[in-house]
């Protein structure tokens, strides 16, 4: 059984699936994994006929703790330590920093067919919806301290309280420390040295903790959100889910302070881009927007779903990785077309769709599109029509156009020079002047064998290319190296049969003869 369907099968009663994000900067693609995982759990519950709601929170009362490298540091440095919702917007179209970055993320939700009910922490605090929980946790601070010590070995002092005030003098929230509570107000100090990235102003005083004047620390806040929203399912990343980590602390607070069961939880792994874990505030890795611009929505969902949640996804948008992603997706589409029964293998395909059905199409190989786009004077739409086994439906054409746009974007933004195909149409490339006698003999024989190639199609040409290596007993690697050097001046390239099929037969044979003539 697919992992999300198992969660749905075990769930009893009304379910609230929740996820959240701190909009500290441009949201990276790694954050999409949690979003898609929660969306799929929500869909699995709906698929199982169970009552369910999907909520997504914006943790915009968290402090700005770093100025991302892509923003003007001098402009935003004065706002370090401020709640994100109180920091100016980096651009037009949003009233503040938090909404500026989360709006872009929500656009990607829509692109991926994800439609949760969204909420902002500023609204929960300012409206008073968290007031009762603030009072509860301030009155049971000794229990909260006890949990921190038992679960995470964090020893809080006797005058520590689980609350941070927004300083009335300087507006920072990261620098304030609450050291007393009289039942209605907290006493706080905006300490100069409470963080390593910004100084507090030194102001102190008594203030009501209610109605948006401050926030709970996020492990405690997490528990308050669960209770207020009625959350029954919330997964968390591996970093939060380690023994003694933030999820263990939150679970224990939920049980020992509120005396309630925490939501169902199972950890999920990171997405690495080129082996690097991504960070929104540090700007490390590819942003969710960049990857959404590269991949069609179903393929981006499929990237998140083709591996188990507890398995790391290492996504390097190089030629091998991206062409394999499309190829794996097309394989499942073809299997579904033959037998439209939703087996466990096909559930990742089903949940990759934007709706509740799998729309089959005639797959056109993505790697072939990448090659075709690099052939001079070639009409790619005509080539697709000619190379397709059947006439294209409107939906087939839609998918092809989507993939052409993706391949163009990949070539422009992600392909390195070794992955690009530069055909030498006017003359024999320089590196083809250094072939071995064995390679030259192969080139000469291949020119003869290709004269009879009919039809001039990839499979036929690839067969002749291979059979000629056997005929002359030359290692295939040496033979292919000679071909690539003779046409693209590189030692490696796309399938030679496919490459030749894009070119005129007369040109290919003529080029092979030109190479041979260099050694006569």
Q: Could you describe each region identified by the protein language model?
A:
Residues 23-29, 84-96, 122, 126, ...:
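The substrate-binding groove and active-site-proximal loops of carbohydrate-active enzymes
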Residues 75-108, 112:
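A glycine-rich helix N-cap at a beta->alpha junction
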Residues 242-243, 247, 257, 269-413, ...:
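Catalytic adenosine-cofactor/nucleotide-binding cores of aminoacyl-tRNA synthetases and other
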Residues 28, 137, 296, 483:
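Residue-level signal for inorganic ion chemistry
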């Amino acid at each position: 059984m697919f992992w999300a369907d198992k969660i749905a099968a075990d769930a009893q009663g009304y379910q609230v699936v929740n996820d959240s994000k701190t909009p500290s900067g441009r949201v990276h693609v790694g954050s999409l994994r949690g979003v898609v995982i929660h969306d799929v759990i929500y869909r699995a519950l709906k698929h199982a006929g169970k009552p369910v709601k999907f909520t997504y929170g914006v943790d915009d009362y968290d402090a700005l703790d770093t100025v991302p490298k892509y923003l003007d540091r001098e402009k935003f440095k004065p706002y370090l330590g401020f709640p994100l919702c109180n920091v100016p917007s980096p651009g037009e179209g949003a009233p503040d920093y938090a909404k500026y970055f989360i709006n872009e993320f929500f656009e990607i939700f829509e692109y991926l067919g994800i439609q949760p009910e969204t909420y902002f922490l500023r609204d929960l605090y300012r409206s008073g919806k968290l007031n009762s929980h603030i009072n509860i946790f301030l009155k049971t601070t000794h229990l909260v301290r006890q949990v921190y010590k038992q679960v995470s070995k964090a020893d809080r002092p006797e005058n520590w309280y689980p609350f941070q005030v927004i300083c009335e003098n300087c507006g920072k929230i990261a620098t304030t420390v609450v050291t007393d509570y009289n039942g209605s107000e907290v006493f706080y100090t905006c300490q100069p040295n409470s963080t390593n990235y910004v100084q507090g102003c030194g102001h102190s005083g008594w203030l009501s903790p209610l109605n948006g004047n401050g926030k709970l620390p996020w492990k405690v806040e997490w528990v308050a959100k669960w209770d207020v929203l009625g959350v029954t399912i919330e997964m968390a990343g591996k970093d939060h889910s380690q023994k003694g980590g933030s999820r263990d602390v939150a679970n224990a607070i939920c049980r020992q302070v509120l005396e309630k069961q925490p939501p169902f939880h199972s950890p999920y792994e990171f997405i690495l881009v080129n082996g690097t874990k991504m960070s929104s505030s540090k700007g490390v890795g590819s942003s969710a927007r960049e990857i959404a611009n590269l991949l069609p929505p179903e393929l981006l969902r499929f990237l998140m779903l083709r591996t188990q949640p507890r398995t790391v996804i290492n996504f390097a948008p190089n030629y091998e990785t991206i062409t394999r992603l499309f190829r794996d997706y097309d394989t499942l589409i073809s299997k579904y077309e033959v037998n439209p029964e939703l087996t466990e293998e096909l559930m990742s395909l089903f949940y990759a769709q934007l709706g509740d059905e799998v729309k089959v199409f005639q797959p056109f190989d993505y790697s072939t599109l990448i090659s075709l786009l690099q052939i001079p004077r070639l009409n790619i739409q005509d080539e697709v029509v000619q190379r397709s086994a059947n006439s294209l439906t409107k939906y087939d054409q839609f998918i092809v156009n989507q993939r052409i746009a993706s391949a163009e974007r990949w070539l422009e933004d992600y392909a390195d020079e070794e992955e690009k195909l530069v055909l030498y149409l006017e003359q024999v490339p320089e590196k083809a002047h250094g072939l071995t006698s064995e390679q030259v003999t192969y080139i000469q024989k291949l020119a003869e064998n290709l004269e009879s190639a009919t039809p001039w199609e990839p499979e036929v040409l690839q067969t002749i290319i291979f059979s000629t290596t056997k005929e002359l007993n030359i290692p295939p690697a040496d033979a292919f190296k000679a071909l690539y050097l003779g046409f693209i001046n590189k030692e490696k390239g796309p399938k030679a049969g496919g490459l030749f099929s894009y070119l005129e037969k007369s040109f290919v044979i003529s080029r092979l003869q030109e190479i041979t003539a260099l050694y006569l």
